[in-house]
């Protein structure tokens, strides 16, 4: 649904190129006639990029891959994921907080999944003064894919 919704706005879908939610987004974009990009990582247990990727780039190092995600993204939609997903998201949040990159819309799909993380951000780092309200105020947590896509596209022509 996410990839197809982005394709309908003529916006490329860029994922890690793997299975699961990444594959679903790439497939949706590809089948809807949009651009489907996969930035995969060389890991001992990872397969080749999923078959729905139109442009595949493979990276040896996570930091290079994260730089490419940050550099070539005007917004991000995060689906539930593991440590790799968290690493990519916190990298982008850190770059925006420290003004090493411009702020871009970050949207988190899945209130049940991401809600606890946002509760923790407010109760620990924010309440202890390690982050500021503006560091998290613009972040959206939603279950609505159309709302997620609209928010991620805010500020760009789509």
Regions flagged by a language model, labelled:
Residues 140-158:
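Glycine-rich phosphate/pyrophosphate-binding loop and the adjoining helix
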Residues 1-39:
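Glycine-rich beta-alpha loop segments
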Residues 23-27, 91, 136:
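Residue-level recognition of conserved structural "scaffold" positions that shape functional pockets
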Residues 3, 93, 149-153:
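A generic alpha-helix structural signal
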Residues 23, 47, 151:
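Active-site-proximal flexible loops/turns
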Residues 42-135, 141, 147-148:
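Conserved phosphate- and dinucleotide-binding cores of soluble alpha/beta proteins
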């Amino acid at each position: 649904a996410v990839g197809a919704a982005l394709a309908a706005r003529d916006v490329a879908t860029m994922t890690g190129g793997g299975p699961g939610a990444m594959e679903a987004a790439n497939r949706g974009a590809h089948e809807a006639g949009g651009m489907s990009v996969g930035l995969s990582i060389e890991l001992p247990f990872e397969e080749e990029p999923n078959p729905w990727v139109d442009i595949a780039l493979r990276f040896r190092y996570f930091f290079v891959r994260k730089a490419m995600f940050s550099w070539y993204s005007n917004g991000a939609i995060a689906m539930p994921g593991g440590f790799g997903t968290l690493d990519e998201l916190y990298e982008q949040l850190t770059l925006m907080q420290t003004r090493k990159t411009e702020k871009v819309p970050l949207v988190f799909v899945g209130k049940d999944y991401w809600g606890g993380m946002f509760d923790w951000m407010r109760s620990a780092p924010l309440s202890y003064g390690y982050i500021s309200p503006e560091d998290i105020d613009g972040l959206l947590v939603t279950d609505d894919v159309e709302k997620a896509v609209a928010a991620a596209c805010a500020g760009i022509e789509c």
